[in-house]
């Protein structure tokens, strides 16, 4: 019986990094097994770096010395001890990292990619949409010219937030500016480019509906988190008056919440995040629930390379896969070079086919990037926006 013999938890980052302030640090767990194999997992930060890191120490107490093949058992054991697991982002994120690393170990022990253990390859290439590409873009021409640079890289889908510094409410002027941006993107890039509208859960219901109705004519692929997350009942009214499909899910932490949203018709495209909703196996369960109600999957993927590799392994197996978020071409070099394995070419992700998650760590670089502290903070710009756009 192979067990987890040692656990190393790394906070990695580059002080002053501004390209993605919500992930200027990343959290990595390294599990070393009794046979010497190494598995990597990742937990998200999003202005929660230190509490998530401490929660990872709690998960370590449950997982260490256990048989990592027993994923269901180990997960349930932590669930038993963690009183607030179902509602604690810190707990679910920490647990997700260990679950992902366990799969990496299992795949390496068996000499096969994780996706082969989840049903095998259904999608050989995964269409990506660009995110993070529009830093410092404020005017329509800024968005269009930057998007054209990414089209040259092969991207055919772009997510962006055109709402600048509007929060809770948005007036006619703010709506007009957003419409001007989306209109320019549609007219300049054409109908064959998909536009994905990011709201970041910033609006109350009435204003979200006004925004959605104003943007319907541009036929977005989806509109993401149009309403404050705690105002979930407003989604019923939103969907009654807006035609664009609704996408959300990165703030939902368990399959039961996803089941409620999809079964009640509050969401069309589910953006679960493997690194805060209990990992790879739970992602498969969530995807199956979503598929049974005719929904599609477009996993949230805004942090680091281990998250991406884990997400792609699930994507490979899904019959209801729609599209995959990608920040890779907006990452700083340190994050891009930390792990190698998967690649993105001509706007599509491709895994390496190597055992486990299919990635290899640059451990020397990892040692150089060890960091202790919170993410970068700018009192004039919330952590969740793309830099230079909240003005």
From Swiss-Prot:
Listed A to Z, the keywords are: Carbohydrate metabolism, Lyase, Magnesium, Metal-binding
* List of residues binding Mg(2+): 198, 224, 250
Q: Which PANTHER family match?
A: D-GALACTONATE DEHYDRATASE, D-GALACTONATE DEHYDRATASE-RELATED
Q: Provide the reaction this enzyme catalyses.
A: D-gluconate = 2-dehydro-3-deoxy-D-gluconate + H2O; D-galactonate = 2-dehydro-3-deoxy-D-galactonate + H2O
Q: Which cofactor does it need?
A: Mg(2+)
**Induction trigger:** Constitutively expressed.
Keyword Metal-binding carried by entry: yes
Q: Which residues form the active site?
A: 200, 300
EC number(s): the record gives: 4.2.1.140, 4.2.1.39, 4.2.1.6
The entry describes the temperature dependence as follows:
Optimum temperature is 70 degrees Celsius.
User: Site (Transition state stabilizer): which residue positions?
Assistant: 325
How, per the record, is the cofactor bound? Answer: Binds 1 Mg(2+) ion per subunit.
- SUPFAM superfamilies according to UniProt: Enolase C-terminal domain-like, Enolase N-terminal domain-like
A GO term, aspect molecular function: metal ion binding
* Protein name per its UniProtKB record: D-gluconate/D-galactonate dehydratase
Cite the annotated pathway: Carbohydrate acid metabolism; D-gluconate degradation
Question: What is known about this protein's pH dependence?
Answer: Optimum pH is between 6.
Report the sequence similarity comment from the record. Answer: Belongs to the mandelate racemase/muconate lactonizing enzyme family. GaD subfamily.
State what this protein does.
Involved in the degradation of glucose and galactose via the nonphosphorylative variant of Entner-Doudoroff pathway. Catalyzes the dehydration of gluconate to produce 2-keto-3-deoxygluconate (KDG). It is also able to catalyze the dehydration of galactonate to produce 2-keto-3-deoxygalactonate (KDGal).
